[in-house]
């Protein structure tokens, strides 16, 4: 247990529980470094194996990478399960990693460690997210720009969470990715296209769409207004 706890401290996770029992539950914001932490754990200690309910890693020469969760776990290994909040039932494993804000599931468990600092996007995005009710921090700099949906062309990777918006984009010949297609993905520049002026229909979906970028987030919405409801 010490090896994973030491890594959590290394990656600046905050400990909430004095007594740790299995499963160790770790919650963090997008870009906190949980995938990097898990990969480092696999390289450090062969007793561990890792699975994800999201997008699996590419195979590695070591033969030990974050694989897609199939519901089966090997004997004699300490199993780490990433993106556990995407599941409806949580298996008995050694450690669980996830972001309950990105999920509407009832499977969320009480956290032993948390991290609210993102290394992916920057302080401008975090300022917007805090205004919308999400506690996310960053020491990086980035750009956020909110524009009217009909007056500005999208930049970078275009994403959406509402089906009618996807239909509108396709009708105009705009290549765009749905919520399901961006899970586990990161892009330099993202344009989030929405019919809303605040995240009401599906807050978790809007949160995911606004946390996929590294350097710039553009939001295209009616009247160039996107604020808390």
UniProtKB/Swiss-Prot annotation:
Transports viral genome to neighboring plant cells directly through plasmosdesmata, without any budding. The movement protein allows efficient cell to cell propagation, by bypassing the host cell wall barrier. Increases plasmodesma size exclusion limit. Acts as a suppressor of RNA-mediated gene silencing, also known as post-transcriptional gene silencing (PTGS), a mechanism of plant viral defense that limits the accumulation of viral RNAs. One of its GO terms (cellular component) is host cell cytoplasm. Residues 1-132 form the (+)RNA virus helicase ATP-binding domain. Keywords: Host cytoplasm, Host-virus interaction, Inhibition of host innate immune response by virus, RNA-binding, Suppressor of RNA silencing, Transport, Viral immunoevasion, Viral movement protein. It is found in: Host cytoplasm. It holds the Pfam family Viral_helicase1. Belongs to the Tymovirales TGBp1 protein family. One of its GO terms (molecular function) is ATP binding. Residues 133-229 form the (+)RNA virus helicase C-terminal domain. It comes from the Viruses. Its main location: host cell. TGBp1, TGBp2 and TGBp3 seem to act together for cell-to-cell propagation. TGBp1 is the main movement protein that physically cross the plasmodesma with the viral genome. TGBp2 and TGBp3 would facilitate TGBp1 function. Homodimer and homooligomer. Interacts with capsid protein. Interacts with host AGO1; this interaction targets the host protein for degradation, thereby suppressing the antiviral RNA silencing. InterPro entries: (+)RNA_virus_helicase_core_dom. This is Movement and silencing protein TGBp1. One of its GO terms (biological process) is transport of virus in host, cell to cell.
């Amino acid at each position: 247990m010490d090896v994973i706890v030491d890594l959590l401290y290394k990656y600046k996770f905050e400990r909430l529980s004095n007594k740790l029992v299995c499963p160790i539950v770790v919650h963090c914001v997008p870009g906190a470094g949980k995938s990097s932490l898990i990969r480092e754990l696999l390289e450090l200690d062969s007793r561990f194996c890792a699975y994800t309910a999201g997008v699996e890693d590419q195979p590695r020469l070591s033969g030990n990478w974050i694989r897609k969760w199939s519901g089966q776990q090997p004997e004699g290994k300490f199993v780490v399960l990433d993106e556990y909040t995407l599941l409806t039932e949580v298996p008995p494993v050694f450690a669980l990693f996830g972001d309950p804000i990105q999920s509407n599931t009832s499977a969320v468990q009480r956290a032993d460690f948390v991290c609210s600092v993102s290394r992916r996007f920057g302080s401008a995005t975090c300022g917007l997210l805090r205004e919308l009710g999400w506690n996310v921090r960053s020491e990086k700099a980035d750009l956020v720009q909110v524009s009217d949906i009909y007056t500005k062309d999208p930049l970078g990777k275009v994403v959406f969470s509402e089906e009618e918006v996807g239909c509108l984009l396709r009708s105009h010949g705009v290549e765009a990715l749905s919520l399901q297609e961006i899970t586990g993905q990161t892009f330099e520049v993202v344009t989030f296209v929405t019919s809303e002026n605040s995240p009401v229909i599906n807050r978790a979906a809007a949160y995911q769409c606004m946390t996929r970028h590294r350097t710039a987030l553009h939001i295209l919405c009616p009247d160039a207004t996107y604020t808390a409801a």
